[in-house]
Design a protein with these regions (language model features):
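N-terminal nucleotide-binding beta1-loop-alpha1 segment
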Residues: 1-17
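Acidic donor-binding/catalytic loop of UDP-sugar-dependent glycosyltransferases
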Residues: 79-85, 99-116
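Conserved donor nucleotide-binding strand/loop of the catalytic core
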Residues: 65-78
Length: 270
């Protein structure tokens, strides 16, 4: 049986929205609400919050200790190194990458991707629901064997490969066997629905969703969110002008497998 380790990377020093992981969602921090959702999934194995050695992230370690969660501290800016070292420290054979800025992630989506990985009979090196994306932005799940992560950790040289952990892998389809888990409904909301957090408007959106759904149903899922947005279009509009904005926009000249249709600039960048 493979030792599966899910690594959630979190730090307080966000450049666009400082301390976003400690913002309040229904009486707990955003990080806690997000990790609670990850832990609702059936197949996540050992869950580790990987924060940095920066003193300001002592608070993240304290939160993890209070909740009885695993915490690893590593490189502040080389996320590939931090991810690899965390997986190594917990004896991982299979490594799952879930970012900490997706507090609306659906545990059922996490399980769907992990079941694809665990039930594969053919060789694979990387399975995600991101390449290409079809799910609402903010349901990011990536899985790779430890030897593949080790190859990336050893060989990746570009700054964006170190910062974003997995581009070295999915940018090399000629070398690695890549598989993608699409939304079974046949929809593509990857550029139209934004459930991640980088800007104050994202926080307003996520806070509104939590306040509407969490008190009655802490295990609310993707369909619950979509039904809420249909009934309350004013919530959907809160961060709509950022829909489709992601880190790809700053690296289109470097990324071979990403097209301009898979990203957009913010209004002030256009």
């Amino acid at each position: 049986m493979s030792q599966l380790t899910t690594v959630v990377q979190a730090r307080r020093g966000s450049s666009r929205l400082p301390d976003k992981v400690c913002m309040d969602l229904c009486g707990s921090t955003l990080l806690e609400r997000m990790v609670e959702r990850v832990l609702m999934a059936k197949h996540v194995g050992t869950v580790v919050v990987a924060t940095t050695t920066d003193p300001q992230d002592n608070l993240i370690q304290s939160i993890c200790e209070q909740r009885g969660w695993n915490c690893f501290r590593g490189h502040p800016t080389d996320l590939l190194d931090r991810h690899y070292q965390a997986a190594l420290a917990y004896g991982a054979d299979l490594v799952v990458k879930i970012p900490s800025d997706v507090p609306l992630i659906d545990p059922a989506v996490v399980d769907l991707v992990l079941e694809q990985a665990l039930n594969q009979t053919e060789k694979w090196d990387y399975i995600s629901n991101l390449h290409p994306g079809t799910w609402p932005d903010g349901n990011d799940v990536e899985v790779m064997p430890m030897d593949v992560l080790h190859a990336a950790w050893t060989e990746a040289r570009l700054p964006m490969e170190r910062e974003h952990t997995t581009p070295f892998i999915w940018e090399r389809p000629e070398r690695f066997v890549l598989k993608n888990v699409v939304w079974p409904l046949g929809l593509d909301y990857s550029m139209s629905h934004r459930f991640t957090i980088d800007y104050p408007e994202d926080y307003a959106f996520i806070k509104a969703v939590y306040e509407a759904l969490w008190p009655q149903n802490p295990t609310f899922g993707l369909q619950d969110i979509l039904h809420l947005l249909q009934r309350n279009p004013e919530i959907f509009q809160l961060n709509q002008h950022y829909a489709g904005v992601n880190w790809y926009r700053n690296h289109l000249n470097e990324l071979k497998t990403i097209s301009v249709q898979q990203t957009k600039k913010t209004t002030h960048e256009s």
